[in-house]
Amino acid sequence: MDKYNLPELFAKGELSDCQLVLDDGKEKISLNIHKCILYTASPYFKGMFGNFSEQKSNKVTITVHNSLVSSNIIKSFYGITTPKQNNWKYKLDKHICKNFFGLKTRLTNNIKVPKTNFNEFLDTIELIGYNEKTLKMIINNVPKDYNFDQLPLDLLQSMVGIYDKYDILIIKDSTFSVWSLNTKRYTHNFKFNGKISDFESVKNNKLFMIANTSDNLDVSDCSDSSDDSDNSDSDNSDSESLEKPKKFFPSKDDQCICVFDVKKYTVKKYFFYKNNKKILPKDIVCYIPEYNQVIVGNSGYIDLFDLDSKNFIRNLGVYETAYATHVDNDILYIVDDFGLHLIQFSTNKKLHKFEIISHRVNFDTKNIVIGEKFKITIWSKETRHVVSEWEMSAKIKSTLIIPGLNYIIVATSQRIYIYDLNTLLRIKKHDISSHHLVDLQEFKEKFIIIVCDCGFRIFDLDSGLVIDEFDIESISYINIIEGQYYDTIKKIKHSISKKLTA
């Protein structure tokens, strides 16, 4: 007797004991099937042909989500393979149909939905149900110009916590690496050929730094057009009309300002000139995004340059050992060995000087937190006086202001102390003696980054627990940056806010 294989048995329809009609409301597909094969392959058909009236029927019609997909699934019971489908609709419909037949199914991650099909995609996802995987699919495929206001509030709220909106920029041994908190891996690496001597915090997706590099990077020759006047570096000079050098040939190694674009992962070099001479950035760089200007420390002089026009604007004063600068409401704050200096930014008028002996200074919109060796001082920007100060029992390692929580964080090698920014009362403290703290960085919400001598930790300020840790030695710089989903999550939160206040 000839032995039938199952694909041939199905194709010829021999010994078929039932005609199965699949109806999705748009298309009907009729199959000559064998009840025993469907019975053994699918819990759905096992129930149908084992316990219900259909077990004696020679024709059965069932309503399915997609007739074609259901037909291909049933054919697979006979060992019949169909061409692989990459269409997003087919993949999702297959998941729905397999689930209907009681079969094991797993949603694939590589769903790519055309912009024109996004609303249809949302309807399909609603049939599947909202869970972490389907919500990720929505976020991954949402059009850039999509109006989230048309989605229900509960769906928007469930989408917010699915992806972390931040990544972490890590610089180690002149290698720039971006660590994704979503994939738990490095997504970008950039080798910088040179030595970096100073960093500024990331602003407007740009990291400004002073570097000595021979890289053939994108070079912006920031020449000005001034003369060689002897008094051009006086405190009250407004602007200098410098003439661009006729020729400039970069030396093999150039001390310059480098700007790393954390979105495009590119580095651009800037050479600045004053009095027809190229300056050598030394110990300070401060980017002012609202004006697209940069403050540069230059052999004791603090100079201001415009990045749009590439011109020298004016000298801001002489501060041989400046450690930090900050601009807020037309006030320039400069920290040097002699104290905290306040200067009217638009006029260079000196306003105030406050004597401090610390370089550890944090700026808030209202206050300045100064961490000396064993003392914390809170200085008011409005009154320009000390509003509070207190002694610490151990040497201060780091200080941090978290405006969103109204927190002042003070860290010693053993503990983290949390103070209320308004009342200045201590809220709580946490033991961190096992982490070998080097510095603190703001992260998000109630979390901070503890930089250690062997990596960094993500620390929960409420519980005092480490929720994630990364062993990376010799970190030169670490900062949070906008991640892949930053803009999308920002739009979702905006829509939630509108719905809650409507």
Swiss-Prot record:
Source organism, top-level taxon: Viruses
Compositionally biased tracts (Acidic residues): 224-240
Pfam family for this entry, one: BTB
Annotated spans, Disordered: 219-246
Domain BTB: 16-86
Record family assignment: Belongs to the mimivirus BTB/WD family.
Official protein name in the record: Putative BTB/POZ domain-containing protein L89
